[in-house]
């Protein structure tokens, strides 16, 4: 079990701890943000940006909260689990950028002054209203649906390839190993996204 300061990460990233000890939750997420400052987008991120430039109807649906897709230049982006560099007010629900790290104190809302929380989906919470519906609509409209670097076990997002397939899309999986959705993929490309996507772009455009 992965722990930090002796606490399971599932507890540190939980809605329950956000209610009882928001300062500790922020300290945990600030630790994670500090690690992310050393990470930059890879060739796979940039390949997706290039696809977006080439195709008018392109939607990138991500469960990642690290902001690397946006840093690479992706525009039509649905962050279904939120963004670790954004905060959301606990009173008025306004969202705002919160990029200072390390944090000196818990961020407060620029609108009403109340305390804020990380704008991410915590354990024990539902997805933000409307975000999955938009993702599912994009999946059902797709002619080609890539499933990239996911274990395909976190629902409801893991159901999106099924929705795309049922609507007639061709599904291509890119992953280091087989997953629970490999059986429905038309093609499974085994390997790292940072290596496979640029090569796929070069060969197929």
Predicted regions and their residues:
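Conserved catalytic core of sirtuin-type NAD+-dependent deacylases
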Residues: 1-205
